[in-house]
């Protein structure tokens, strides 16, 4: 059931280069294209709306590389269900990554809301111990600080880029509206619109002549 779907979803996300088809009770539940693009796998697993609300992340700090996607601040959620971390290609639950992600989003989203992500973290094997949890779902970092820093800065820099792009497009829109208003003849002569086009004393005289 759900546990199987969950495993297939996570495997598909960690291997966008492999095409997956999952059929349950004769119905196709999941199909990924295997085109090597993470965004394609996300689209297949989580759907179009989720995929459209994402910002790309691509960052390296020393020996640690962080890449994937985070949700736009306006697409935050009421829970952490859509936080997906992969360390060296394996789906992992890690408090360090979760805290780093949420700290980077502080001030960008409302309190009580949570960011979503599909983030790959590549790091040297010697700084992790995967044998903490029987299912190997949790990891312990020999040194948490560099991992926290890499994820925090990766997310923060992507959010800042997104924010500056949003501000730039808002400025562009505002500037365009100002230019339009400047060159709109009706804006400069609003009185014309409120009065009849032809009105003069001569006209009154003509009307009076015909009225006789």
Stretches found by the model and what they are:
Residues 1-212:
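N-terminal phosphate-binding caps/lids of nucleotide- and nucleic-acid-binding domains
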